[in-house]
Regions:
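Phosphate-group recognition and catalysis centered on beta-loop-alpha active-site segments
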Residues: 1-250
């Protein structure tokens, strides 16, 4: 069985993560599922960014949660230290920009992960409302995703939207909570799985395991019950003969 592939922050092995350019590159390579991260600026603008701070992707000091959108919109996040001159002028995108792109790609589904730093700073209600308002036109193709089960419960109560819970730990308590939450998708770092695990526990969810960059590993995880694997190297996996699209899929 061949799992479906999710582009983790876009085609992040080759392109700047969480940028329009990186997401477009993933889709151009054949990805049908993308994932991106959402933080909130101090003036309430949802932005697409993994870390709350700017050091890693922008190479400069500062916390995005303390800055206004007018300050953030021209910040370059081309990750030149990691990627060189692949896309040096890529700018930190607003969620609105990514939404507008998704609106032009009707076959693409997105996992929109709300980051816990913004939830802690601004509160579940404010962050969720800002995200849902922006994503409303494409919400039928977006899965609200988070480590926070609280924001996912609120999302489900406010909208008829699919949710994905990201496990901090793979243990009995987390699985009991997952059964109660009943998300459509359950994310987990595959390295957190017990080595003795033969089959992932079934539930109302589909399993999404990350961070996977090896085709044989993707197949092995699929045998354990993973319907999806998430990868920053999505383009490489899509072109790997082991994961040929002509093979049997979920």
């Amino acid at each position: 069985m061949v799992p479906k592939l999710v582009a983790h922050r876009g085609w992040a092995s080759r392109w700047p993560e969480n940028t329009l350019e990186g997401l477009m590159a993933a889709v151009d390579a054949g990805a049908e599922y993308v994932e991106f991260d959402i933080q909130l600026s101090v003036d309430g603008m949802p932005i697409v960014l993994h870390d709350a701070t700017l050091e890693r992707t922008a190479g400069r000091a500062g916390c995005a949660l303390d800055m206004r959108w007018d300050e953030l919109k021209n910040i370059k996040v081309g990750e030149t230290g990691r990627l060189g001159e692949v896309c040096p002028h890529a700018r930190l995108p607003s969620l609105s920009l990514i939404r507008d792109w998704l609106a032009t790609e009707p076959e693409i589904n997105a996992f929109a992960e709300i980051k816990t730093e913004s939830l802690s700073r601004f509160g579940v209600g404010r962050v969720l409302e800002a995200c849902l308002q922006v994503l409303e036109p494409v919400l039928d193709r977006c899965v609200m995703t988070s480590f926070s089960d609280e924001v996912l419960l609120a999302a489900r109560q406010q909208r008829e939207t699919s949710i994905a819970w990201v496990l901090e730990r793979y243990d009995e308590q987390s699985l009991i909570r997952a059964t109660s939450l009943a998300p459509e998708y359950l994310f987990c770092n595959y390295r957190k799985l017990p080595g003795s695990l033969d089959m992932l526990p079934a539930g109302p969810w589909q399993w999404v395991l990350y961070e996977v960059s090896d085709a044989q590993l993707a197949l092995d995880l699929a045998k354990k019950g993973a319907g999806f694997v998430e990868s920053m190297a999505v383009g490489e996996l899509l072109s790997d003969p082991l994961l040929d699209s002509g093979s049997e899929t979920f």
